[in-house]
């Protein structure tokens, strides 16, 4: 659903509507990420011991994100909103390359490719929605566009199959992790900002 009909002038969507859409979208992205990870795991990672290697090597690890709801509760909502923006921006580049590289895989499974394309598209929509939310919650605040730079493209293009598959596995593992965090942060922010923490 487009937030404003095309050509609409001064279209104002309520903050509650924006949050509703953002929460639905982030939940959808997390579901797709989980499905894509599970599909990849089943098809390519069996018996390769990837999980034990994939600990704490996400490109967004440099952004200190709260690990659970209790930690997130301690963070001021302005900082949490900015953190969500940073994590979403940090995924623009890797998602673009993920789609390109999956397309180039031999017998690229449609179950993985179609989800990668959809996630890239929806991540952009969620980022736009979050920028609108920040604009309403803190009008006039110029948010600096800080994000974590991803440098994993060479590993997705390695000639060695094991190394390449592990790079894909790790990226999908991180995507699932981060999409889960964003989903939780947005639910928490919606509760705080829209319902004054009465939920």
Swiss-Prot record:
InterPro entries: 4_helix_cytokine-like_core, Somatotropin/Prolactin, Somatotropin_CS. GO terms for molecular function: hormone activity; prolactin receptor binding. The modification Phosphoserine is found at residues 26, 34, 90. It is found in: Secreted. One of its GO terms (biological process) is female pregnancy. It comes from the Eukaryota. Its main location: secreted. One of its GO terms (cellular component) is extracellular space. The keyword Transmembrane helix does not apply. Keywords: Disulfide bond, Glycoprotein, Hormone, Lactation, Phosphoprotein, Secreted. Glycans are attached at residue 31. Disulfide bonds join 4-11, 58-174, 191-199. Prolactin acts primarily on the mammary gland by promoting lactation. Interacts with PRLR. Belongs to the somatotropin/prolactin family. This is Prolactin. It comes from Camelus dromedarius. The lineage of its organism: Eukaryota, Metazoa, Chordata, Craniata, Vertebrata. The gene is PRL.
């Amino acid at each position: 659903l487009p937030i404003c009909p095309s050509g609409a002038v001064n279209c104002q969507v309520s903050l509650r509507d924006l949050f509703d859409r953002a929460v639905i979208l982030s939940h959808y992205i997390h579901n797709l990420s989980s499905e894509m990870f599970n599909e990849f795991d089943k098809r390519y990672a069996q018996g390769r011991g990837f999980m034990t290697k994939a600990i704490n090597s996400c490109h967004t690890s440099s952004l200190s994100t709260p690990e659970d709801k209790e930690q997130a509760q301690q963070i001021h909502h302005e900082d949490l909103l900015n953190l969500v923006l940073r994590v979403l921006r940090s995924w623009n580049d890797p998602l673009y390359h993920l789609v390109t590289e999956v397309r180039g895989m031999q017998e690229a499974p449609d179950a993985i490719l179609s989800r990668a394309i959809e996630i890239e598209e929806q991540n952009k929509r969620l980022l736009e929605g979050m920028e609108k939310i920040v604009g309403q919650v803190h009008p006039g605040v110029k948010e600096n566009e800080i994000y974590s730079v991803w440098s994993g493209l060479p590993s997705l293009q390695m000639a060695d199959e094991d190394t390449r598959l592990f790079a894909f596995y790790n990226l999908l593992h991180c995507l699932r992790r981060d999409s889960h965090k964003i989903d939780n942060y947005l639910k928490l922010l919606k509760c705080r900002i829209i319902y004054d923490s009465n939920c």
